[in-house]
């Protein structure tokens, strides 16, 4: 992942709440209830981030989640309307296989992974969720997979070759 932090105030970010759960802490006097929110933010132009927030009230949890997501933004390369190459993201028990698709295919992905890909700015991409359907693990696996993406120019530079040599 990139070391430099991305300034969220420069971007026009859209946010999407993926998951809200009521969580419980059992104490001597009974149970303490709080709400946990999983939020994805993105500018639909190559920037996407995920965050989680927890609070006594749902709106506060969502607000905290948005703040957290803005701190965890990553930049993803978009080639045309799709991903540059196939990749697998892993987080916990969640595996997400992200594959390029032809123009006009649309976003073929299930549940929270679809939201991540939409907010990242992809128009044509296929994804398969494997291992778990826990929203947090799926979203983080998708972010992990997207953070591994590299353009052909970057790969060529790392290998010390020209793009023509790389692509044959």
Swiss-Prot record:
- This protein's GO CC annotations: small ribosomal subunit
MF term (GO), any: rRNA binding
- Domain S5 DRBM intervals: 13-76
Q: Show the stretches that span the lipid bilayer.
A: none
Gene Ontology biological process terms from the UniProt entry: translation
Concerning SUPFAM superfamilies, the annotation shows:
dsRNA-binding domain-like (SSF54768), Ribosomal protein S5 domain 2-like (SSF54211)
Q: Does the keyword Phosphoprotein apply?
A: no
Q: Which InterPro entries match?
A: Ribosomal_Su5_D2-typ_SF, Ribosomal_uS5, Ribosomal_uS5_bac-type, Ribosomal_uS5_C, Ribosomal_uS5_N, Ribosomal_uS5_N_CS, Ribsml_uS5_D2-typ_fold_subgr
Q: Which UniProt keywords apply?
A: Ribonucleoprotein, Ribosomal protein, RNA-binding, rRNA-binding
> Superkingdom, according to UniProt?
Bacteria
The reply to whether Transmembrane figures as a keyword in the UniProt entry is no
Similarity comment: family membership: Belongs to the universal ribosomal protein uS5 family.
Q: What does this protein's UniProt record list under function? A: With S4 and S12 plays an important role in translational accuracy. Located at the back of the 30S subunit body where it stabilizes the conformation of the head with respect to the body.
PANTHER family hit by this protein: MITOCHONDRIAL RIBOSOMAL PROTEIN S5
Indicate the quaternary assembly. Part of the 30S ribosomal subunit. Contacts proteins S4 and S8.
Q: What does the entry's free-text domain comment contain?
A: The N-terminal domain interacts with the head of the 30S subunit; the C-terminal domain interacts with the body and contacts protein S4. The interaction surface between S4 and S5 is involved in control of translational fidelity.
Name the record gives this protein: Small ribosomal subunit protein uS5
* Species of origin: Alkaliphilus oremlandii (strain OhILAs)
Q: Name the gene.
A: rpsE
């Amino acid at each position: 992942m990139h070391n430099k932090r991305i300034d969220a105030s420069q971007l026009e970010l859209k946010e999407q709440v993926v998951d809200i759960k009521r969580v419980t802490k059992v104490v001597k006097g009974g149970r303490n209830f709080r709400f946990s929110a999983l939020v994805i933010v993105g500018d639909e132009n190559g920037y996407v981030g995920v965050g989680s927030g927890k609070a006594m009230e749902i709106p506060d949890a969502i607000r905290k989640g948005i703040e957290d997501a803005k701190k965890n933004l990553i930049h993803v390369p978009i080639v045309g309307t799709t991903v540059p190459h196939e990749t697998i993201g892993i987080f916990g028990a969640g595996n997400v296989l992200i594959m390029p698709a032809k123009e006009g295919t649309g976003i073929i992905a299930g549940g929270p992974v679809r939201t991540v890909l939409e907010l990242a700015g992809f128009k044509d991409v296929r994804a398969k969720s494997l291992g778990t359907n826990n929203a947090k693990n799926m979203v983080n696996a998708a972010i992990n997979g997207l953070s591994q993406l590299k353009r052909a120019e970057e790969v060529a530079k790392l290998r010390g070759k020209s793009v023509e040599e790389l692509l044959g």
